[in-house]
């Protein structure tokens, strides 16, 4: 039995199959942890989502910004962007089933036995692991509940940009979502900078990669994340593992075995 964490797939079905063949994945005994952005921008989003749904009992999934965007588009709360490749999913006869499954997924997963946490973008330096899990549950409960469309309709936006425990309602949910699904750079007190998408060296004044702060409350916790392709999987911070290696941009799709730390990759075509 093995557990593999896989970076952003983004509808790249063939590299995913290549990777599963390389690791000799067995649904009967192995598990996959997926860092989110399962779909969008790649060539085979529908095939990817259908396949993942078919092996759902072997998966732990956290949602990425593209997955949440699909939900908003599907429910008519947002229009597709020019770079989106979501139409085949939206028009699929099994779309309601796939979308319902996606809506049940997490923003954060933690396995104390394996000793890893899984998120799409990151955890702000001001949150402990328990605080992050509690905040993730707030959004997950809303997304799974009867009023989920209200959340999706108010999800977009860059404000508020800094955490305050007194935040309430949709502003609170939006900031939690931005931390988990959009964050790259922030300040030591958790203020988000959502404009810069280049590598760590491009940090604007006063900001740094979320994982780089000495006083970060999760420094002793092992965190797997995706989202930040410009890092090319390179992080010089202990206990932090960047798994988005730019598959959809012609890079690689990466899997990491949680039991051994071994990396396996398949090359992708842009």
UniProtKB/Swiss-Prot annotation:
Pfam families from the UniProt entry: Metallophos
Upper classification of the organism: Bacteria, Pseudomonadati, Pseudomonadota, Gammaproteobacteria, Cellvibrionales
Gene: apaH
Role this protein plays: Hydrolyzes diadenosine 5',5'''-P1,P4-tetraphosphate to yield ADP.
Catalysed reaction, written as an equation: P(1),P(4)-bis(5'-adenosyl) tetraphosphate + H2O = 2 ADP + 2 H(+)
Record's protein name: Bis(5'-nucleosyl)-tetraphosphatase, symmetrical
Entry-linked CDD domains: MPP_ApaH
Stated family: Belongs to the Ap4A hydrolase family.
UniProt-listed SUPFAM superfamilies: Metallo-dependent phosphatases (SSF56300)
Statement: the UniProt record of this protein carries the keyword Hydrolase: yes
Organism: Cellvibrio japonicus (strain Ueda107) (Pseudomonas fluorescens subsp. cellulosa)
Record keywords: Hydrolase
InterPro entries on file: ApaH, Calcineurin-like_PHP_ApaH, Metallo-depent_PP-like
UniProt enzyme class: hydrolase
Coiled coil segments of this chain: none
Known EC number: 3.6.1.41
GO MF annotations in UniProt: bis(5'-nucleosyl)-tetraphosphatase (symmetrical) activity
């Amino acid at each position: 039995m093995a557990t593999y964490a896989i970076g952003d797939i983004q509808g790249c079905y063939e590299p995913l199959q290549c990777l599963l063949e390389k690791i000799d994945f067995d649904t009967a005994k192995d598990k996959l942890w997926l860092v989110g952005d399962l779909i969008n921008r790649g060539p085979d989003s529908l095939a990817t989502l259908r396949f993942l749904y078919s092996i759902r009992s072997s998966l732990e999934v956290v949602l990425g910004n593209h997955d949440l965007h699909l939900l908003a588009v599907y429910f008519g709360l947002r229009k597709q962007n020019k770079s989106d490749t979501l139409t085949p999913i939206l028009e699929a006869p099994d779309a309601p089933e796939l979308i319902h499954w996606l809506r049940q997924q997490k923003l954060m997963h933690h396995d104390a036995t394996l000793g890893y946490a899984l998120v799409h973008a990151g955890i702000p330096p001001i949150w402990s692991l328990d605080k992050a899990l509690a905040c993730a549950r707030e959004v997950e409960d809303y997304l799974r509940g009867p009023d989920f469309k209200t959340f999706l309709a108010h999800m977009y936006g860059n404000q508020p940009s800094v955490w305050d425990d007194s935040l309430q309602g949709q502003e609170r949910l939006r900031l939690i979502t931005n931390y988990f699904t959009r964050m790259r750079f922030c300040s030591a007190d958790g203020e988000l900078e959502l404009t810069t998408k280049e590598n760590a060296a491009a940090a604007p004044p006063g900001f740094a990669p979320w994982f780089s702060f000495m006083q970060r409350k999760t420094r002793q916790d092992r965190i797997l994340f995706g989202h930040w392709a410009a890092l090319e999987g390179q992080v010089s911070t202990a206990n932090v593992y960047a798994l988005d290696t730019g598959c959809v941009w012609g890079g690689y799709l990466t899997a990491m075995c949680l039991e051994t730390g071994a990396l396996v990759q398949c090359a992708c075509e842009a």
